[in-house]
Amino acid sequence: MWIGNGISELAGAFGTFCNSLLIYEITGSTWALGSMWLLYFLPSLILQLFIGPYLDRWSRKWMMIFALWSRGIIFLFPLIGFVSDTLVPWHVYIVQIIIGLITPIYSPANQAILPNLVSKEQLSSANAYVEGMARLMTFTAPVVAGIVIEYIGIGSTLLFICTALMLSGCLLLGIMEVREEKVERKTWAVEFMEGVRYFFQQKTIVWLGIFLAFVQFGVGVTMVINIPYIKTVLNGNNAMYGYFMAGFPLGYMFGTLLVGKIKFQSRRRLMLGALLIGGVTYINLGITSSLISAIATEIVAGITMAFFSIHNITLCQQTVPNHLMGKIISVRSFIIRAMMPLGVLVGGALSELWGIRPLYILIGAIITTVSLVGLLIPYFAFLDKESINKNKLAA
């Protein structure tokens, strides 16, 4: 499973890289690039909203295999179009829609199946191996994809993606899944509303979600403008784009190594201070004319985001009772991820009107302002509490 996950993460990152380049090279439009991401996020969000309560009722192993094989097959579509020189934007859009529908199936099934494969004592180590591999692939893929596409072309890269995804699905066939007996469950509406009610009763979760939502909005904007930023504004090539995209995950990896070693008296100052620095990195991207400076800025952004994200997750885990964790995370993820399509929409529209640099500065200004509000207003002192009182959910 560990090897299969690694291969699928690498192939998925390659696929995202190829799709983005194909759309931008065919159209030359940031609006078209934004439309591609909207067609990924909107079906993904809709399915995530409805499928959550049903995932535990199906075989997680076969859901994962189905998702991987489906992704491998669907990437044949742009491959055939590219080789036959008939590729048009809607070919890539179809791929994005289907991948958007598959992702809410694969990701939670991948996380949920692990406790069935290892003992409780080994679970922490197993999660570390899986997450470590995912981070490594996230860091490696942009660099490798940029170099590979530069030297062997997009067609050969698409063929590799199809093969790798099919292979990763085959590797999961050996998993011996232990399934629990079916029990009577509440309806989807009851379970969903239960999670929504509890979510909005907890101001810690709500406000951390709001802070993170602003970050995700910025991420959505950069999904549209990163390619033209490197290739047009900074005059880089595909390999340079790969180095730039690898900067953030590389910084994030460094950040995860530092988080546990840095002692703090105020969690609020640590988290929101990191978010403030992250906002400044966006502003620097809007100003700098150096590709090396841009890559270094992304590394710093990754380090700071690791501090904010890990403490954000920790506070959420401290707040939510175990029996509600799945529902709350599902609701929280839906609300946060919903900001990304908005960012994509804004990025696609305003980049055509304002240009690329002003958008980076705008995102940075928004994130730094939100961070300063959280740092300076005494109301947010509740983020420093070591223990958080849990409200009991009414039956």
Where are these regions (language model features)?
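Substrate-agnostic recognition of the 12-TM MFS/MFS-like secondary transporter fold
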Residues: 1-16, 40-55, 59-74, 91-149, ...
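Helix-loop boundary and gating motifs at the non-cytosolic
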Residues: 1-43, 201-246
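Alpha-helical transmembrane segments and their helix-entry boundary regions
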Residues: 1, 17, 32-36, 63-64, ...
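C-terminal transmembrane bundle of multi-pass solute transporters/carriers
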Residues: 46-49, 57, 61-63, 67, ...
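Membrane-interface helix-capping segments at transmembrane helix termini in multi-pass transporters
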Residues: 22-34, 76-96, 101, 119-121, ...
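Juxtamembrane intracellular "pre-TM" segments in multi-pass secondary transporters
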Residues: 177-210
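Helix-loop junctions on the cytosolic side of multi-pass membrane transporters
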Residues: 112, 116, 158-186, 376-389
